[in-house]
Amino acid sequence: MTREDIIQAIKEMSVLELNELVKACEEEFGVSAAAPVAVAGAVAGGAAEEKTEFDVILASAGANKIKVIKAVREITGLGLKEAKEIVDGAPKTLKEAVSKEEAEDMKAKLAEVGAEVEVK
């Protein structure tokens, strides 16, 4: 398997599959994918600029889990099994690096069905 084959396989993965891959690599090689602390300090200095990309995080499914699963499927385009895994495993990141408008729209749809959502 060539490097290009590996990259192509990664490109075809969903966010959920990529998250599982990162966790498996961390466990297998005893490393962490977290950014070094020095980098986080440098980013904090530029935080005065307005943020343009946001992460949408499902904090809790609330009481109406079935409606939340349907909303997650609609928002992410995932299958029933994957959407259920995300809802059952909350808190989970639904989408990363989306516009403020898209993040607020997702938050509104999920809040409408009773989910607790964070936009970071």
From Swiss-Prot:
Keywords: Ribonucleoprotein, Ribosomal protein. Pfam families: Ribosomal_L12, Ribosomal_L12_N. The keyword Nucleotide-binding does not apply. InterPro entries: Ribosomal_bL12, Ribosomal_bL12_C, Ribosomal_bL12_C/ClpS-like, Ribosomal_bL12_oligo, Ribosomal_bL12_oligo_N_sf. The keyword Nuclease does not apply. GO terms for biological process: translation. It comes from the Bacteria. One of its GO terms (molecular function) is mRNA binding. GO terms for cellular component: cytosolic large ribosomal subunit. Belongs to the bacterial ribosomal protein bL12 family. Homodimer. Part of the ribosomal stalk of the 50S ribosomal subunit. Forms a multimeric L10(L12)X complex, where L10 forms an elongated spine to which 2 to 4 L12 dimers bind in a sequential fashion. Binds GTP-bound translation factors. Forms part of the ribosomal stalk which helps the ribosome interact with GTP-bound translation factors. Is thus essential for accurate translation. This is Large ribosomal subunit protein bL12. It comes from Clostridium botulinum (strain Eklund 17B / Type B). The gene is rplL.
